[in-house]
Amino acid sequence: MPNILVLGEQPQFRTLLSESLWFDGHLVESVGDAAMLWEHLGNTQPDLVLLDAHSDGFGAMRLYQDLKQQFPDLAVIVYQCRNYGDVDRIKGAVADALVKHRFSGSGFNVSG
């Protein structure tokens, strides 16, 4: 089963996403900031990193670029749990694809 690392400053989103993946049978670890991410990557490399596009404490786009530069084969998905106002900017800046989910207090609802 793939090892997934979730990075996001918002504990409620990070926990919901981590628990959802864990219940689906994935090995999941989560961190709340970029320093913890780099520390984690110094010890072990996950199969996939999920990176919150709207973290205030670190530049998600810059962090994505740094991750891909240091670990070109590392799969990184940029996610967001807020409004879709910057979707085009995010996709144009770094993403090969963008998966959008609407967040409600009870979970994620897929939308196109």
Predicted regions and their residues:
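Conserved phosphotransfer microenvironments
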Residues: 51-67
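Acidic, metal-coordinating helix/loop segments flanking the phosphotransfer/catalytic sites
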Residues: 30-48, 88-89
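Acidic phosphotransfer microenvironment of two-component signaling modules
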Residues: 11, 32-36, 59
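Two-component/phosphorelay signaling modules centered on CheY-like receiver
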Residues: 11-29
